[in-house]
A protein has these predicted regions:
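A domain-level signal for the structural core that forms small-molecule/cofactor-binding pockets
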Residues: 1-130
């Protein structure tokens, strides 16, 4: 669970640390705005990606399933700055098929946490393999 009050306090401290006045009119709402933004950016922290993939259907064929152009936004775990990307997922079903709507949700859950791009791709692959 996100600690919004802790985030707001940290933003106030950050503003002080860079020489800004957090009580300045233009910055008064910044701590709340950052806490609100982080609640979305970090919604995947603690989430279980395999739960997203729980609903499957019998595979009538074992052809490759491909879904392209899944847009994503994540936060670099080294710099806490956003990065964007596009994921393309292809997999061979093993008697069961994942609903196509579940694949973007999987990407969203895994991207919504402090992340590195190279780890994100491995985590998506690992979740699909399980």
């Amino acid at each position: 669970m996100l600690d919004a009050e802790g985030i707001k306090a940290a933003v106030v401290e950050l503003l002080h640390a860079i020489g800004e006045d957090p009580t300045r009119d233009e910055l008064k709402a910044t701590p709340q705005k950052v806490a609100d933004a982080y609640s979305g950016f970090f919604a995947g922290v603690g989430a279980k990606p395999l739960e997203v993939l729980a609903d499957t259907f019998p595979a009538e064929q074992n052809d490759v399933v491909i879904l392209k152009d899944i847009e994503l936004v994540s936060i670099c775990e080294h710099h806490l700055l956003p990065f964007t990307g596009v994921a393309h997922i292809a997999y061979l079903p093993n008697d069961r098929v994942i609903g196509l709507g579940r694949l973007p949700k999987l990407v969203e859950v895994l991207a919504s946490r402090p992340q590195l791009q190279e780890n994100l791709t491995a985590q998506i692959a690992d979740a699909l393999e399980e």
